[in-house]
């Protein structure tokens, strides 16, 4: 089974994205989808994340990396069935195919929770080098388990920056500073921000102290390395409950 066949089996086709959404990906490097997850789905994910965090504590995210001031979870698909619905978000799958335009697979799955008074990130990209426009390798997403508000650590994005062929650290004096063209993404829980990994973005300071749990589910070119090699961590439980289409995309 190839990627296109897998997407067809999951109900994704050329009409999944509207012309306006495709234009947003082309011009801005991101789109916002509201109601990407049902309330009962993200409520279960919040509960499961918190339960796993009680066990993993400061080690949470160890499979990829840990972060002071932002509790993390990595390898979530192997740890809980509640996160499976993320693999069914059709606009995300369609966007990955639209941007990458060839065979792709899951790159990584992480959850990040910016703690009160923490969470500020440098503006960055999620790909390790600058690329020419069109030479894209990763599509990332922010799946909001809590609302993004102006003061709880919402993401800032620089629209159109994926077309620059540059990385923020190469042109900004300090990527922690505000960028003159950045916008703050505010949206209700269940929303999904889909972004080209070369679009400049970063988390902001959680001033209010409200919860700000967000899933990062990314897809990469099939021949590129995964953030977490799925076959090294694949459990029998995940293998048994995944359809052939899902297994194809998990690689």
Over which residues does each language-model region extend?
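Catalytic core of non-heme Fe(II) oxygenases with the double-stranded beta-helix
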Residues: 118-186, 224-233
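Conserved metal-binding segment of the jelly-roll/cupin
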Residues: 186-201
